Amino acid sequence: MFLVAARPSIGKTALATSMVCSICIGAKVPTLFVTCEMSEASIARRIMASVASVSMGTLKRGNLNPNEYQRVFSANSKIGAAPLYYCNAVSGMTSAQVGAEIRRAVRKHGVKVVFVDYLQKVLPTKRHEKRTYEVAEVSSKLKAIADSCGVSVVALAQLNRESEKEKGRTPRLSDLADSGQIERDADTVCLLTRNREESRGEAQLLVAKQRDGECGSVGLWYEGPFCRFDDNPELKEVP
């Protein structure tokens, strides 16, 4: 299981949709996106903004200029041809129900990669006396599903407030919210950080755990209007 964690409004979903654009739309790998917080339409709009390089605000208002309209038309063709499937879990789904949806998508569509946005929003199959036990159950179930179905699960997760108490402190594995079991279940843990007050700018993806590799950090460029992360700062200009 591959885990991407950050504080709210840092860009977890934007990073996930950027990965979808590369894995599914670019490489045509069958992908399932389990959305527990935003509607399917909201995720689809973010993917459109990323692929077309048209801002979310412009897409919402619908006042596209001819150049933007052409980019949206082209992006729509690319997205429509991609093997991308959705599971809407906004109303609440247990880990068992999410597992059933993943297995169905694997059987029906040959899905190879699953995104879960986000882990702490998935419900446990039964109530526990402590929140940490509930999150631990969900994390363990997602790990088991990944292993049994032979799929790569990319789970998003929240960091707790400790990462923000000290100004300038980078996130740590111990900042994962609600359960240390998440850290133990994940094969790779990446912690995303940036200045949330900037709509564009540099970001860091800290590889805090990697079971079969080295840890370190990767520099990214955040394009807030397009809900996108690029790995090359020279791509920050609007085409």
Regions found by a protein language model. Give the residues of each.
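Conserved lysine of the Walker
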Residues: 12-13
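Hydrophobic alpha-helical membrane-association signature
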Residues: 16-19, 98, 134-141
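The Walker A (P-loop) glycine that initiates the GxxxxGKT/S ATP-binding motif of P-loop NTPases
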Residues: 5-6
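Conserved H-loop
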Residues: 36-38, 151, 156-158
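C-terminal regions of RecA-like/P-loop NTPase motor modules
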Residues: 53, 88, 95-111, 140-149, ...
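Helical hairpin unit composed of two closely spaced alpha helices linked by a short loop
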Residues: 103, 111-155
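Cytosolic-facing regulatory segments adjacent to core modules
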Residues: 18, 22-110, 124, 198, ...
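Walker A (P-loop) phosphate-binding loop of P-loop NTPases
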Residues: 9
